[in-house]
């Protein structure tokens, strides 16, 4: 698809995901034992034929930029293909991006240089699989100014999203960002139609909208709050329903905003379901990433004769379980689990050592942590709260490189 430029917004602070985002951008947070969050959006682009991609970075972007370099330097510039990381250029003044629309406005020169007819705007911090090609086809067929991908959710959940109203032709006639009382679907009072933060603009429409928005001192320079509501009046904004039968990706209807510790934890745990709600195993839709070349995971008997055990868990390469027990957990690469240690309902990031006799329950252990022998985490909320962050649902988070 040579006529479309893809812009991935990857510069948000992700403060609700702290401490996992204390030293990295949210799209660079590890997920599922081997991936980074942004890998899902980039994989969708790859399989959808989108080969001109700008990744707009900002907040603590080193880890993200390194991942893009190591894992995604796969396109051929001689064929006009690229994935380019774009930090703030300060071309329109020495300030950080003030909103999603402002981020693209400050890089309009790159859009103009691309000579594309259409611009796809994506977020780098959602977990889902989607073929974007049919959405572009509908955008062109409708002669739309803007096409917004959408899905229906429970009305209570809709408060966190932009809520849309559409007619029988899927033309959008209303859009309100994060309403306290979300309007429901006409045929279902318990469900609302929400934006997924996936947009296709016709280039000239986007350019004009961003220029006008930049001149509006009252604007928050956000797509959901400012750009989309104004474009609706043109009558050329259409909705594209996610989870249809179009495209090459299997219909699993899974999309998650992993902006909080609890939503991030649950999205990981979803992968451990007997039939996961998101299919990572579709042969022609593999999730690409960068992964160090570690040897295969293994179990080994400990000195006391205990066998290493994995039950209903995802285990990455380089893991050695020497007499420990791992149940319903995700263990990333190069992790060492020692004798009589137990890990239950937990997420372990790379390069962690879990000492003899440790008990870890309902926790997330970030990278480069050495958990001392017989440490308990997730069993005593009062003790855990003195050392670590605990989410609303009781998930204990041990930050990167924490020293016990």
Swiss-Prot record:
Signal peptide: none annotated. GO terms for biological process: glycogen biosynthetic process. Keywords: ATP-binding, Carbohydrate metabolism, Glycogen biosynthesis, Glycogen metabolism, Nucleotide-binding, Nucleotidyltransferase, Transferase. InterPro entries: ADP-Glc_PPase, ADP_Glu_pyroP_CS, GlgC_bac, GlmU/GlgC-like_hexapep, NTP_transferase_dom, Nucleotide-diphossugar_trans, Trimer_LpxA-like_sf. Gene3D superfamilies: Hexapeptide repeat proteins, Spore Coat Polysaccharide Biosynthesis Protein SpsA, Chain A. Alpha-D-glucose 1-phosphate binds at residues 97, 162, 177-178, 195. The keyword Nucleotide-binding applies. GO terms for molecular function: ATP binding; glucose-1-phosphate adenylyltransferase activity. Pathway: Glycan biosynthesis; glycogen biosynthesis. CDD domains: ADP_Glucose_PP, LbH_G1P_AT_C. It is an enzyme of class 2 (transferase). The keyword NADP does not apply. It catalyses: alpha-D-glucose 1-phosphate + ATP + H(+) = ADP-alpha-D-glucose + diphosphate. Involved in the biosynthesis of ADP-glucose, a building block required for the elongation reactions to produce glycogen. Catalyzes the reaction between ATP and alpha-D-glucose 1-phosphate (G1P) to produce pyrophosphate and ADP-Glc. Homotetramer. PANTHER family: GLUCOSE-1-PHOSPHATE ADENYLYLTRANSFERASE, GLUCOSE-1-PHOSPHATE ADENYLYLTRANSFERASE-RELATED. Belongs to the bacterial/plant glucose-1-phosphate adenylyltransferase family. This is Glucose-1-phosphate adenylyltransferase 2.
């Amino acid at each position: 698809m040579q006529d479309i430029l893809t812009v991935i917004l990857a510069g948000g602070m992700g403060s609700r995901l702290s401490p996992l985002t204390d030293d990295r951008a949210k799209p660079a947070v590890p997920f599922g034992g081997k991936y980074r969050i942004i890998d899902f959006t980039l994989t969708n682009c790859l399989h959808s034929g989108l080969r001109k991609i700008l990744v707009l970075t900002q907040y603590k972007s080193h880890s993200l930029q390194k991942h893009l370099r190591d894992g995604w330097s796969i396109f051929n510039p001689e064929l006009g293909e690229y994935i380019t990381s774009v930090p703030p250029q300060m071309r329109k003044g020495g300030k950080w991006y003030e909103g999603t629309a402002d981020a693209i406005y400050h890089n309009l020169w790159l859009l103009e240089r691309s000579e594309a007819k259409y611009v796809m705007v994506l977020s780098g911090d959602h977990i889902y699989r989607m073929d974007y090609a049919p959405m572009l086809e509908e955008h062109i067929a409708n002669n739309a100014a803007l096409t917004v991908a959408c899905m229906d959710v429970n009305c209570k959940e809709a408060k966190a999203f932009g809520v849309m109203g559409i007619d029988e032709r899927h033309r959008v006639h209303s859009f309100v960002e994060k309403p306290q009382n979300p309007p429901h679907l006409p045929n279902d009072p318990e469900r609302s139609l929400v934006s997924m933060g996936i947009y296709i603009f016709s280039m000239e429409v986007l350019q004009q909208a961003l220029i006008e928005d930049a001149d509006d001192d009252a604007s928050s320079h956000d797509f959901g709050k400012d750009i989309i509501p104004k474009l609706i009046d043109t009558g050329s904004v259409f909705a594209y329903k996610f989870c249809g039968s179009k495209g090459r990706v299997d219909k699993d209807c899974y999309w998650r905003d992993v902006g909080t510790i609890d939503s991030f934890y649950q999205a990981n745990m979803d992968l451990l379901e007997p039939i996961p709600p998101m299919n990572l195993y579709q042969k022609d839709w593999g999730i690409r990433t960068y992964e160090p070349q570690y040897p295969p995971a293994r179990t080994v008997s400990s000195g006391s004769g205990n066998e290493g055990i994995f039950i209903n868990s995802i285990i990455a390469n380089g893991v050695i379980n020497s007499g420990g027990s791992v149940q319903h957990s995700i263990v990333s690469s190069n992790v060492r689990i020692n004798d009589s240690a137990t890990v239950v309902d937990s997420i372990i990031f790379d390069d962690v050592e879990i000492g003899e006799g440790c008990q870890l329950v309902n926790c997330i252990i970030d990278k480069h942590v050495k958990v001392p022998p017989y440490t308990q985490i997730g069993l005593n909320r009062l003790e855990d709260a003195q050392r670590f962050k605990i989410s609303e649902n009781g998930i204990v988070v041990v930050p990167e490189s924490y020293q016990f």
